[in-house]
């Protein structure tokens, strides 16, 4: 996959207008042979994706569950251009998720991308997020926003991913589903939903377990999810959401190139240190929506939660003899919460419609961070994988207060102007409580602020063709984890680290063709003060600011469903992400550690392709085939190690039967159909060259579900 897409881009942009003119305009009665009418969530309300002046995709929850295990977002988001989701097969570290290259540096969790679940941020104020609490079994839809307008969501919003829980409808419905597959993998889910008068409800619970394809990669995850909606007499709406997740996962770690070549399923270091992670999280959110009058509305959201994490790492006892070392066991306890108040109004400007949004968001995080040695006994004869002496104790706090506003003005019959601004201010404070000997008081504070403007212009060329251009500025602060360690073995937080600032421009086209939707976008993002790895030794990574980076890209998407229920999907991404300035990692500079200008940013594939064909009637037999290809991915900044590109295929078939009040569904699926051996993801800049996380070989999944409507 090395061909330049430039010629294809020119043909596409020249051909879309002619193709759109050749198709009859869709009518409200059209129905069969067209994609169903859908909307996506924006600050100003629900809008059809075709009318959004930016790159946004929606994946329906039923589609995410169709013929799949229903555990990871990587199973079902392949049809979203610009989104790279890699399953590490390591449930101690979450998925590797990036949007247009933002988030690619993350070695665990999600950074650089803003995540929301039912409107509640799954990204904390410092920019660190996770997807493990998303219950695919109860998801109504997932929406992915890319491009300049994602900056309106504040810090670390190189892209935005939102998941929404379904609302209960009709008479009570009780459902059970189960799926099992290779390597001791299984999932069970139970759900109750419905509505009665002004109240709708959904309660769900699921348990997932796997023995793991690799050695020392077993995991268990329990999720409970609830949603309660109450329509008040005055037309207002109150929604309560609850979510809880617990994860117990072994950490198989990465492999060196030699280890991957000889024994990709082994995890020798992980078994020696018994590396593992335990996570417990519970959160609650309350949303109040009020219609003030015919033109104005008010939305008030408040949420709170707690997350506890304990992680055992593979840091040698010898490295922990430095009196400033924080140990090999991480013990985190976090309390978080926030408020978002938003006012919307439908006004007039020069006798033209003007939609206005103004709001204020406040988010806070309080963290107790402790570090312990991961051994007992002597350095020469240690008992590994147990909690030892305390080596770190601190209380950290992060909070942000962000006012924002957005306006959409229909300035002419075919022209729409949209603009917005957000003032994002993020405050960090650390109170050191481990002051022992040479380990001095490292308390401190930092404050990062930036004004983030965005603007777009949309032209409705025909009823079936829309063109747009957008520009915007975003920024990304370092996370608490990136601030946690300083180079040279010094203790305390790295408050010298600065936020990165990016400027983005995008040109796009959307065309409705033969009942399908074709989207195309060209974009460029220039970033200064990119946050990159400085050192990665002794089990600890430190970070620094590099110079400038540039991301040039092209995305193409196609969604179509015929009248006889054949569904096709295509997503292609070309992304050239490079460092524009040279820097050294680690510092000081030497020939071996100089990152040259022009080097590719690691963790990002230059090209990716997803294609699927499925027969999906509303009842009876259904089947499909999927193909996914990914180009070579660099594993480090100096570009001396990489994971080769690959292409894999999957087949699935199932049967859906509806009988009176019952509904039954069964399926079988084979992934990696041709048993391709490849690297599923890389651990960017891993200090011991253990970059590679192998993907599993050919594997199968079978599942069954049954539901009864009372």
Task: List PLM regions with ranges.
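Conserved C-terminal beta-signal and adjacent last beta-strands/turns
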Residues: 231, 243, 469, 505, ...
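Membrane-embedded beta-barrel scaffold of Gram-negative outer-membrane proteins
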Residues: 287-289, 297-315, 460, 466-472, ...
């Amino acid at each position: 996959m090395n061909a330049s897409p430039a010629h294809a881009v020119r043909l596409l942009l020249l051909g879309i207008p002619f193709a759109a003119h050749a198709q009859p305009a869709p009518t409200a009665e059209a129905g069969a042979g067209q994609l169903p009418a859908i909307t996506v969530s924006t600050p100003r309300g629900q809008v059809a994706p075709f009318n959004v002046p930016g790159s946004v995709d929606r994946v329906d929850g039923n589609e995410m569950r169709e013929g799949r295990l229903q555990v990871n977002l990587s199973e079902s988001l392949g049809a979203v251009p610009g989104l790279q989701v890699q399953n590490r097969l390591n449930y101690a570290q979450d998925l590797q998720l990036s949007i247009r290259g933002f988030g690619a540096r993350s070695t665990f969790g999600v950074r650089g991308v803003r995540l929301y679940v039912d409107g509640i941020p799954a990204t904390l104020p410092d920019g660190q997020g996770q997807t493990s609490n998303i219950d695919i079994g109860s998801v109504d839809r997932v929406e992915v926003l890319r491009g300049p307008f994602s900056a309106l969501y504040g810090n670390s919003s190189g892209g935005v991913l939102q998941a929404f829980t379904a609302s209960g409808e009709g008479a009570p419905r009780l459902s059970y589903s189960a799926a099992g597959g290779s390597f001791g993998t299984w999932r069970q889910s139970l759900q109750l939903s419905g509505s009665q008068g002004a109240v709708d409800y959904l309660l769900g619970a699921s348990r997932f377990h796997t023995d793991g394809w690799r050695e020392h990669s077993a995991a268990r995850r329990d999720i409970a999810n609830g949603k309660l909606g109450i329509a008040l007499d005055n037309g207002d709406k109150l929604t309560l959401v609850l979510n809880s997740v617990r994860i117990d996962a072994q950490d198989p770690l990465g492999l060196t190139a030699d280890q991957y070549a000889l024994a990709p399923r082994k995890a020798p270091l992980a078994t020696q240190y018994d590396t593992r992670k335990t996570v417990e999280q519970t959160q609650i959110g309350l949303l109040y929506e009020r219609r003030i009058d015919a033109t104005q509305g008010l939305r008030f959201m408040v949420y709170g939660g707690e997350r506890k994490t304990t992680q055992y790492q593979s840091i040698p006892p010898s490295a922990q003899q430095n009196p400033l070392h924080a140990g090999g066991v991480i013990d985190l306890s976090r309390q978080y919460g926030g408020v978002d108040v938003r006012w919307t109004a439908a006004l007039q400007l020069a006798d033209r419609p003007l939609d206005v949004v103004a709001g204020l968001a406040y988010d806070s995080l309080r963290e107790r961070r402790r570090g312990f040695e991961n051994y007992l006994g002597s350095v020469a004869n240690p008992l590994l994988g147990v909690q030892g002496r305390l080596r770190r104790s601190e209380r950290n706090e992060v909070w942000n207060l962000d006012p924002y506003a957005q306006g959409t003005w229909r300035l002419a019959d075919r022209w729409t102007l949209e603009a917005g601004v957000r003032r994002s201010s993020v405050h960090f404070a650390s109170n050191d409580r481990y002051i022992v000997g040479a380990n001095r008081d490292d308390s401190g504070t930092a404050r990062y602020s930036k004004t983030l403007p965005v603007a777009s212009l949309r032209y409705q060329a025909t009823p079936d063709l829309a063109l747009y251009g957008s520009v915007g500025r975003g920024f990304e602060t370092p996370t608490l984890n990136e601030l946690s360690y300083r180079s040279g073995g010094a203790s305390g937080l790295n408050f010298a680290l600065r936020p990165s600032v990016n400027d983005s421009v995008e040109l796009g086209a959307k065309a409705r063709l033969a009942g399908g939707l074709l989207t195309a976008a060209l974009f460029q993002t220039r970033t200064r003060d990119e946050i990159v790895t400085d050192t990665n030794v002794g089990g600890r990574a430190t970070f620094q600011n590099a110079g400038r980076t540039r991301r040039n890209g092209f995305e193409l998407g196609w969604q179509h469903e015929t009248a006889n229920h054949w569904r096709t999907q295509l997503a292609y991404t070309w992304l050239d992400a490079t460092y524009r300035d040279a820097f050294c990692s680690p510092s000081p500079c030497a020939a071996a550690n100089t990152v040259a200008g022009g080097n590719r940013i690691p963790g990002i594939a230059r090209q990716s392709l997803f294609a699927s064909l499925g027969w999906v009637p509303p009842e009876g037999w259904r089947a499909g085939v999927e193909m996914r290809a990914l180009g070579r991915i660099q594993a480090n900044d100096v570009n001396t190690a990489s994971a080769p590109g690959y292409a894999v295929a999957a087949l699935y078939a199932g049967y859906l039967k509806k009988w009176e009040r019952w509904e039954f569904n069964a399926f079988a699926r084979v992934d990696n159909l041709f048993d391709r051996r490849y690297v599923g993801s890389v651990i960017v800049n891993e200090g011991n060259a253990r970059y590679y996380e192998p993907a599993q070989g050919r594997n199968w999944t079978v599942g069954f579900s049954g539901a009864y409507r009372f």
